[in-house]
Amino acid sequence: MLVTPLLLVTLLCALCSAALYDSSSYVYYYQSAFRPPDGWHLHGGAYAVVNISSESNNAGSSSGCTVGTIHGGRVVNASSIAMTAPSSGMAWSSSQFCTAYCNFSDTTVFVTHCYKHGGCPITGMLQQHSIRVSAMKNGQLFYNLTVSVAKYPTFKSFQCVNNLTSVYLNGDLVYTSNETTDVTSAGVYFKAVGPITYKVMREVRALAYFVNGTAQDVILCDGSPRGLLACQYNTGNFSDGFYPFTNSSLVKQKFIVYRENSVNTTFTLHNFTFHNETGANPNPSGVQNIQTYQTQTAQSGYYNFNFSFLSSFVYKESNFMYGSYHPSCSFRLETINNGLWFNSLSVSIAYGPLQGGCKQSVFSGRATCCYAYSYGGPLLCKGVYSGELDHNFECGLLVYVTKSGGSRIQTATEPPVITQHNYNNITLNTCVDYNIYGRIGQGFITNVTDSAVSYNYLADAGLAILDTSGSIDIFVVQSEYGLNYYKVNPCEDVNQQFVVSGGKLVGILTSRNETGSQLLENQFYIKITNGTRRFRRSITESVENCPYVSYGKFCIKPDGSISTIVPKYLEQFVAPLLNVTENVLIPNSFNLTVTDEYIQTRMDKVQINCLQYICGNSLECRNLFQQYGPVCDNMLSVVNSVGQKEDMELLNFYSSTKPAGFNTPVLSNVSTGEFNISLFLTTPSSPRRRSFIEDLLFTSVESVGLPTDDAYKNCTAGPLGFLKDLVCAREYNGLLVLPPIITAEMQTLYTSSLVASMAFGGITAAGAIPFATQLQARINHLGITQSLLLKNQEKIAASFNKAIGHMQEGFRSTSLALQQIQDVVNKQSAILTETMASLNKNFGAISSVIQEIYLQLDAIQANAQVDRLITGRLSSLSVLASAKQAEYIRVSQQRELATQKINECVKSQSTRYSFCGNGRHVLTIPQNAPNGIVFIHFTYTPESFVNVTAIVGFCVKPNNASQYAIVPVNGRGIFIQVNDSYYITARDMYMPRHITAGDIVTLTSCQANYVSVNKTVITTFVENDDFDFDDELSKWWIETKYELPDFDQFNYTIPVLNITYDIDKIEEVIKGLNDSLIDLETLSILKTYIKWPWYVWLAIAFATIIFILILGWVFFMTGCCGCCCGCFGIIPLMSKCGKKSSYYTTFDNDVVTEQYRPKKSV
């Protein structure tokens, strides 16, 4: 049985009507009437605790609570709630407990007690020492249960469950119905002896273990590892092993990856333009008779109101009854477009009296605000007040604005632009709903930047790599520190398995590399501690055998730790299994080989008019041919069916081999089609060179050097390195050499040495030895360098000529191979040509021309002759049809082979030896060819082999047990013997290693089962044993009249494609090109830096001083001292800047005057 988790059972009640299984983390309810058999059972009724709270007293400061009433409580909206008192319980008294209730939507169930006459408003007075459980709906009681206090001496718990609205008092079921409704509110009304603990719960499925009808253990199906395992297998008892599982848990997290960091949204700006109504008439008397024009009403959005025509009008301020009137509008029409907000807005213009026109329009409700403008209008507008209706006033322009406050409408002068900033918060290592660059899906996101950044994936502004289904496989996000790569994995791993060791759930095996996992063989292991995942733990010590569960060479212990299984050497084996040992060759080094393979995938179709082919235009022949029946139709149906099958299979072939999408990478302007070879490309390293300062201050001289020159340069490095010139000389092939370049310091040194040696004759002659030695060493350097240059020149010329010759051979051989491919197409036409040539054969007739036969002979004789032509030509067509059928079968088989080659060689890497080329497959590139495909296979083939002793297996004879045999696991390799030790190695590559438990399969016996195949003879179908086939055939042949055409004159050839010789020729050319590699003698470039002479430095100093003086003089003469006074520090300039500067100003009267102003400090 799996280990029971912490915080398990704290209370277990199995009473008369119901039972509950209660813990601090969940409560399990089940009907006592339902007694399942012993064992594990999957049921509903489990409720996991989601919230726990407590309450000490809700009766306030009064002496007690009021019995018989419902008071207090809290809103829960949950599947279940449990309200429990302390273990001692509460007395049925107003000083301790009064009422507990649960509200199921419109139904309320409660328990209370009330012994006071007239003081029990809900239940009425009860008998002494009794309690009441009631249910009430819409204020009316419809269920009453009176129970003696003797059964429930104290109140301990009141629990309500949504399943059939079940209510439990002290663990007993006291109310239920046929409805299932969540609990909306609940509470306990009490005074003392608290606290009351409230447990709010949600419903989950559970697996319960029953003994004699009572739940002894419960496992929640809550998504935990233990719950997933137990509820999927309907048991809590597991033996050691691996258990596949699925986890379809609810995805709660979402995230979005935006393509842009920010998005600008430009809104539409609606423009309303108003103009002057030139044809408007003066208004009649009364404000209601003022006519409006150009009414514009804004709906929602952004608006611009254009009142440009008002520039010729004069705004009239509000002056009691005269002019404008807009106290509710804090803006003018000139500022209405300054980003004002409205809930509704309507604008119109009118023409009315300036005297009272605006004010009365606002008072009468025609507008919220009114703006008056004068344009010098006539005195023709009637008044709007009761005493002025017949008076004439000056007409003016009135602008009505009707508005209400809000945010639906905003005014603007330009289309508004709102910038939305997007932030990518990517959720890792959990199943999420994602929206990545507009593609929506669900997946498990992992960060693969460390493994992908070095290969420059998506370097050319790409966003994502899609898989064959079109879903995102890898995507990239630009961050502050560069590109981050993420991989989208499926949420559900079909290979995930729980690991049970020692009866305990200890870990998970999955194919997904999650954080904290460790690699075991081809899977990743995640340890589980206390029901949760934990981080990676290193593999502990090795063991000789594993009494628990093992995976390959790893042993998984009950504590979740991992040990490596290293079995002891088999000291008890008597002999190799079956006493069979043999020497085998196993390759240990390989060469890259390129193999060309041509496969024909289509055939040329043919259509022949059978009747025209047989008889031509002869009517006599056509009449005679009618006696042959539908032979032409049958033959043509065969040819046509071959063509139709060819078309159908060809379409299926190309549709099945065409990839779902073309991901063409661009790698430095190199197109590789569908094949991504970015993993093979490396980033070129930046060349090393001298610093910019050295190249600027020194003149460099380059000369051809020897390999010893680098050591010379390192030896002479430093400020006084020239003094060690002769000391740093090197030898090359026994000769002393020095670089031929001599600097000025060296020249001075050696010249002084030579002059000093000649000063006193023989006494100082030895001083010339350094001069002579260095001169001879430099002459040796020049001679050796010239000889190496000549040798390298000869090698380059010879290798180049050899390479040109091999390239010519290669082009010639490739041309021949392609010519043979083209011959396949040409020979298809040759078959048709041969068929047409059969028209010239007479097939035993007097002529091959039907018209000529009918001219020379009478009708009966001519028909007999033409009958021979018809029979011969039908035979020729039959051969053509048979040839096409045979060709279709062969091409169909070739297409199947091509499909396998594309799927296994092009789209993947084949594991079959020599199926994709010769040797182990690496890469295949397909190319189009006439009527087929050419595959270019890149493989590696063995170059050298190791001769080892191979062993089938071992026969082991333990001391106190029966013998058994061990053999290698299929696919792991073979057992070999090396220096009296035994190892296992792969069959196709020599890699010997120690034998582990995961490499062997145990057989029950050391004996082999031999199977022999008996020879079985099928009896003849003729009962007579004296049946002679030759005799029967001769009888049939003699009795049959026959006359066959001369088939020797008919020649039919099936073309066979053979480019083996040309491929071998290409391989010889490749070897020749490899042999033409040039191995040059190593030369080096000697770069010597020579310092400039002293007079150059003196000229640079003079030029710098002159430049500074000229710059100071310019500042001095122009008066632009500004910031220069404190920068240059020139004394005359400082004294000049200390005075007041002057400037000249030219006035309109062309009088030039001089003005002075104080100096401004900077």
UniProtKB/Swiss-Prot annotation:
User: Which residue ranges are assigned to the Extracellular compartment in the record's topology?
Assistant: 19-1095
Read off the Pfam families from this record. Answer: CoV_S1_C, CoV_S2, CoV_S2_C
Map motif Di-lysine motif onto the chain: 1159-1162
Q: How is it modified after translation?
A: Specific enzymatic cleavages in vivo yield mature proteins. The precursor is processed into S1 and S2 by host cell furin or furin-like protease to yield the mature S1 and S2 proteins. The cleavage site between S1 and S2 requires the optimal sequence [KR]-X-[KR]-R. Additionally, a second cleavage leads to the release of a fusion peptide after viral attachment to host cell receptor.
Q: Which Gene Ontology cellular component annotation is one that this UniProt entry carries?
A: virion membrane
Glycan-bearing residues = 51, 77, 103, 144, 163, 178, 212, 237, 247, 264, 271, 276, 306, 425, 447, 513, 530, 579, 591, 669, 676, 714, 947, 960, 979, 1014, 1051, 1058, 1074
Q: Give the coiled coil ranges.
A: 822-866, 1055-1083
Q: Report residue spans for region: Heptad repeat 1 (HR1).
A: 769-874
Q: InterPro entries under this entry?
A: CoV_S1_C, S2_sf_CoV, Spike_S2_CoV, Spike_S2_CoV_C, Spike_S2_CoV_HR1, Spike_S2_CoV_HR2
Q: Where is this region: Heptad repeat 2 (HR2)?
A: 1024-1105
GO terms classed as biological process: endocytosis involved in viral entry into host cell; fusion of virus membrane with host endosome membrane; fusion of virus membrane with host plasma membrane; receptor-mediated virion attachment to host cell
Q: Which residues lie on this side of the membrane: Cytoplasmic?
A: 1117-1162
Q: Which residues cross the membrane?
A: 1096-1116
Task: Note the site residues: Cleavage.
Answer: 537-538, 690-691
Q: Does the keyword Cell membrane apply?
A: no
List UniProt keywords, sorted A-Z.
Answer: Cleavage on pair of basic residues, Coiled coil, Fusion of virus membrane with host endosomal membrane, Fusion of virus membrane with host membrane, Glycoprotein, Host membrane, Host-virus interaction, Membrane, Signal, Transmembrane, Transmembrane helix, Viral attachment to host cell, Viral envelope protein, Viral penetration into host cytoplasm, Virion, Virulence, Virus endocytosis by host, Virus entry into host cell
Disulfide-bonded cysteines: none
- Signal peptide location: 1-18
Q: What is known of its domains?
A: The di-lysine motif confers endoplasmic reticulum localization for type I membrane proteins.
Protein family: Belongs to the gammacoronaviruses spike protein family.
The record describes its quaternary structure and partners as:
Homotrimer; each monomer consists of a S1 and a S2 subunit. The resulting peplomers protrude from the virus surface as spikes.
This protein's name? Spike glycoprotein
Task: Record the organism.
Answer: Avian infectious bronchitis virus (strain KB8523)
